[in-house]
């Protein structure tokens, strides 16, 4: 006989006997009157069988129908821990309703009239029992055949259970008191008579006793956390209080129990943080690698071993209950049970005690019951509480109302429910069937035989999982067939040939005898897992070796390149040494031919004004300076050498004549231009030697004079701009004091004067930002201020005579044209550059910039070339004849460009608040787009991050201020500072100078061309005349 039929018969019989035993013990005559209106309402669990329905409420305060009153003293209903609730005030007494009719056989069982005559002989009507069992067999005959064939290893004793059970069932009527737990199946719901609330609570306490829901709550290990457990805490049931409906109802659906996590649905195909292992296996039937499969298997074994070490085991070890997160880690979201050997001993002892002892000692709570596990298949729903011993699983609970053929309404309801079940979507049926099949694949032989399950059941499931992780299937149908054969320990030939070692290991795990299977710890120590570790170690070692080989090879290539470069540099140095010796020898021979100066050359090889070739012999005093800057000198030298071939290429030069387009030049300017052209050598080696000579020639700034022009009553004394007149006899200083002060140059030499007063002082309405002297008209000056006003002043009268107010924001810079003294240009924060004429009130033209204009400068070597610096980190050059597009754009600074100066006709120097100066070669620019290759050199050493510190150039020398209250000097061919000078603070009372920055900075510098002297001013209004020595 199939297992499902026998279990169903046992379920029915157990219900009947248990009900009778409990009803006979109810003290019906002593019910409390105040509880007569109390009704216990319950609903049966859902069944997969068509026709199942919920029981109707029965009012027990009224007598039963006449046909039942003879033998019935109390009507009963089905009571479970999940559907227990009390409804008061119910007056429903329609016992003859269709729903009540479904309980008719239960009423008969309760009053002993179901299978006995008036004398109470249970065997007097065996025909009714046979008919009931026959109907159950017919109903179960339509169940899937697979369910009846799940026991390839089931023992023969299962066939004998039904006969023994039938004998106990027939003998039940002969004993008024019998051991109900001996007949109760673990999947059967408890039947209890309805009585007063005190009696109901007593029954609930007894029902919960041993179920693990009233004991101490065991925490779930972190390896086995359910998705439902994240961020939630379950309430513990207090056993010191009487159970109430609120205490009992949550027990059935609680996601966490003592030793077990319960899920409402067996379908765990997806998770919010990954996919289930089943989905992964299904999606990679034919493309899985052995290494990856063994890696996942090792994680599974480690999880199982961790649970076993805590005396727990996994109740649902199957792929659907594992989640594979993106990090390729497995997470168990199923249930687990507690494996306690002491509980097994206690339960075996309690099972041998007579029922009389149990009845007399109802207050004893030490007895532990087995776990109540309802398995609805397919699409099962696990609802369980903890237990103190290994678990058993049984077939689904059969609703006894289904077999009540005497009630026609019951049949009608069965048909309706059957139709509803048929209307379930195909997707749901497919998922349910898939889950049901998976359960059958992973059910161990001892569970099918009805034996206890425990740690060894996990080992069997691991064997099935190992096969699934390694096998290759072309389709789902082939996979299902392989899994069906696996239950009989039949492995595919391809699997045996491809994985012989793994196949033997898999069969070891699938051994029919649990005692012959290894433990999880043995699996971790097995050759299969250790071999995987060795493979990983070998792979890691190979990877490290490959990485090391790649590193060494790359380093070798890099060093060979450096060696080649070094050899090339050495060859270059040898050639330049030979060239320098040749030049020096020729110069020495030339000098010696003049007998008048031969003695001088021998005594002093380096004169103060030495030639380029004589720079080979450096005075001892400058040796330390050269060696301290050897790295920068080296970079400058090799940069110069790299530019030799590029400078001789005509393709890199601009083809237009804008750089040297002069149609109005004075005689002096023509001479200066010719001298500049003659002085500029095309020999890069000679240029470098010249720079080295000049670097070695000067070592410091010497103070030649000081002008203290700061106002004692005005703290705002910053000098923003300095400018010499055409004859360089007077210097104009302007700043935020709103005054333009003109000093006599000779006043710098008079150190005896404490405070110097200007020759002329002109007052402006706003703070001044720039002043510029006209190079042709001696008395004319131009200034810009913070209001955006451009004004022309007459230094002879000390008055301004013309104002230009088209700028809308602060004007930063103004410059007169060297070729046309009546024209000047200004730049402003309104992003415009305006060209003016002294003879016109309105601007002659406007050039719009993408950002604020910080400085403007005319070229001294061209009539039409104009350059300005912008706050967008770029320098723009324009041909004034074509102002729609820039003549070139120079990009390379990292902050706003504060100053622009023409070094010569082909070179521009720019200053920025990024702590650097840059030298630009205009011959390497282009008219379309940026000119990244135009930057020849970058000078660093000074500090300039937020203030305008001044910039001035003369004959290859560059001077600028610093926010460290210093003046720095560079030479055009070398990137490092040649020398520097630090301003000191002057005590206004004593007049003594002390060195304390206190936030001061050098704000303006200006070269005096006649004497190679520099005038510098700082933020306190002090001006110094400095000379390179």
From Swiss-Prot:
DWD box (motif): residue ranges: 866-881
GO molecular function, one term: protein kinase activity
Coiled-coil region: 557-589
Residues annotated to bind ATP: 194-202, 216
One GO BP: regulation of photoperiodism, flowering
Induction and repression of expression: By PHYA under continuous far-red light. Circadian-regulation under constant light. Up-regulated by red, far-red and blue light, and during the night phase under short-day conditions.
Record's protein name: Protein SUPPRESSOR OF PHYA-105 1
Lineage: Eukaryota, Viridiplantae, Streptophyta, Embryophyta, Tracheophyta
């Amino acid at each position: 006989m199939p297992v499902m039929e026998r279990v169903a018969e046992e379920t029915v019989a157990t219900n009947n006997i248990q009900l009778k035993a409990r009803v006979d013990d109810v003290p019906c005559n002593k019910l409390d009157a105040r509880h007569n209106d109390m009704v216990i309402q319950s609903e049966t669990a859902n069944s997969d069988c068509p026709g199942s329905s919920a029981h109707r409420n029965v009012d027990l305060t009224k007598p039963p129908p006449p046909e039942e009153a003879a033998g019935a003293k109390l009507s009963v209903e089905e009571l479970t821990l999940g559907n227990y609730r009390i409804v008061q005030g119910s007056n429903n007494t329609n016992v003859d309703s269709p729903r009540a009719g479904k309980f008719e056989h239960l009423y008969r069982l309760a009053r002993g009239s179901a299978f006995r005559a008036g004398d109470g002989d249970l065997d007097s009507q065996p025909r009714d029992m046979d008919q009931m069992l026959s109907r159950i067999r017919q109903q179960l005959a339509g169940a899937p055949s697979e369910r009846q064939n799940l026991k390839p290893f089931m023992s023969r004793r299962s066939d004998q259970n039904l006969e023994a059970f039938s004998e106990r069932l027939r003998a039940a009527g002969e004993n008024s008191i019998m051991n109900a737990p001996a007949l109760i199946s673990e999947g059967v719901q408890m039947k209890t008579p309805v009585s007063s609330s005190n009696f109901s609570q007593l029954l609930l306490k007894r029902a919960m006793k041993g179920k693990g829901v009233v004991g101490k709550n065991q925490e779930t290990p972190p390896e086995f956390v359910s998705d439902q457990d994240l961020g939630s805490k379950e309430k513990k049931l207090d056993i010191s209080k009487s159970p109430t409906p609120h205490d009992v109802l949550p027990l059935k659906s609680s996601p966490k129990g003592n030793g077990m996590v319960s899920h409402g649905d067996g379908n765990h195909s997806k998770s919010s943080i990954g996919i289930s292992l089943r989905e992964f296996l299904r999606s990679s039937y034919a493309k899985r690698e052995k290494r990856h499969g063994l890696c996942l298997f090792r994680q599974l074994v480690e999880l199982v071993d961790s649970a076993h070490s805590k005396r727990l085991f996994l109740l649902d070890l199957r792929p659907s209950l594992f989640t594979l997160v993106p990090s390729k880690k497995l997470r168990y979201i199923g249930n687990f049970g507690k494996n306690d050997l002491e509980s097994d001993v206690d339960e075996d002892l309690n099972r041998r005690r007579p029922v009389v002892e149990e009845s007399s000692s109802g207050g004893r709570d030490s007895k532990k019951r087995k776990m109540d596990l309802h398995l609805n298949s397919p699409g099962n729903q696990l609802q369980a509480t903890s237990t103190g011993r290994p678990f058993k699983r049984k077939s689904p609970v059969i609703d006894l109302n289904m077999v009540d053929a005497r009630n026609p309404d019951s049949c009608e309801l069965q048909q309706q429910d059957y139709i509803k079940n048929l209307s379930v979507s195909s997707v749901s049926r497919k998922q349910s069937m898939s889950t049901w099949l998976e359960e059958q694949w992973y059910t161990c032989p001892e569970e099918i035989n009805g034996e206890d399950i425990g740690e060894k059941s996990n080992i069997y499931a691991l064997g099935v999982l190992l096969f699934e992780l390694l096998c290759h299937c072309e389709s789902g149908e082939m996979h299902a067939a392989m899994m069906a054969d696996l239950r009989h320990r039949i492995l595919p030939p391809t699997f045996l040939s491809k994985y012989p070692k793994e196949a033997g290991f898999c069969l070891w795990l699938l051994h029919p005898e649990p005692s012959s299977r290894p433990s999880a710890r043995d699996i971790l120590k097995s050759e299969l897992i250790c071999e995987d570790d060795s493979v990983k170690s070998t792979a890691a070692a190979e990877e490290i070796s490959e990485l090391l080989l790649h590193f060494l090879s790359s380093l070798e290539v890099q060093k060979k390149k450096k060696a080649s470069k070094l050899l090339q540099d050495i060859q270059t140095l040898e050639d330049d040494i030979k060239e320098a010796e040749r030049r020096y020898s020729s110069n020495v021979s030339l000098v010696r031919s003049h007998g008048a100066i031969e003695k001088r050359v021998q005594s002093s090889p380096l004169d103060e004004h030495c030639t380029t070739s004589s720079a080979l012999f450096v005075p001892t005093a400058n040796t330390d300076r050269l060696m301290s800057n050897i790295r920068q000198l080296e970079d400058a030298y090799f940069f110069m050498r790299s530019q030799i071939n590029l400078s001789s290429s005509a393709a890199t030069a601009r083809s237009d004549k804008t750089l040297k387009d002069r149609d109005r030049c004075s005689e002096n300017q023509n001479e200066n231009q010719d001298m500049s052209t003659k002085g500029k050598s095309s020999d890069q080696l000679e240029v470098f030697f010249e720079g080295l000579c000049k670097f070695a020639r000067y070592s410091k700034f010497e103070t030649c004079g000081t002008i203290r022009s700061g106002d004692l009553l005005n703290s705002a004394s910053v000098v923003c701009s300095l400018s010499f007149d055409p004859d360089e006899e007077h210097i104009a200083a302007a700043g935020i004091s709103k005054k333009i002060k003109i000093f006599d140059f000779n006043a710098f030499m008079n150190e005896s004067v404490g405070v110097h007063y200007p020759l002329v002082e002109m007052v402006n309405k706003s703070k001044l930002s720039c002043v510029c002297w006209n190079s042709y008209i001696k008395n004319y000056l131009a200034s810009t201020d913070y209001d955006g006003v451009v004004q022309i002043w007459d230094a002879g009268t000390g008055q301004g005579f013309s104002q230009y107010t088209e700028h809308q924001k602060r004007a930063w810079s103004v410059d007169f044209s060297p070729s046309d003294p009546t024209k000047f240009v200004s730049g402003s924060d309104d992003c415009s550059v305006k060209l003016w004429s002294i003879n016109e009130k309105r601007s002659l033209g406007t050039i719009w910039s993408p950002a604020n204009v910080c400085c403007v400068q005319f070229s001294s070597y061209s009539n039409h070339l104009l350059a300005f610096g912008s706050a967008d980190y770029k320098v723009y050059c324009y041909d004034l004849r074509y102002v729609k597009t820039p003549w070139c754009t120079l990009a390379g600074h990292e902050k706003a460009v504060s100053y622009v100066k023409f070094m010569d006709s082909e070179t521009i120097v720019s200053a920025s608040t990024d702590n650097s100066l840059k030298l630009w070669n205009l011959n390497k620019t282009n008219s379309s787009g940026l000119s990244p290759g135009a930057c020849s050199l970058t000078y660093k050493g000074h500090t300039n991050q937020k203030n305008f510190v001044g910039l001035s150039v003369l004959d290859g020398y560059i001077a600028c201020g610093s926010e460290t209250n210093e003046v720095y000097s560079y030479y055009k061919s070398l990137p490092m500072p040649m020398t520097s000078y630090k301003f000191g603070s002057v005590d206004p009372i004593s007049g003594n100078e002390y060195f304390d920055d206190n936030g001061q900075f050098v704000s303006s510098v200006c070269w005096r061309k006649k004497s190679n002297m520099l005038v510098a001013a700082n933020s306190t209004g002090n001006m110094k005349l400095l000379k390179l020595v």
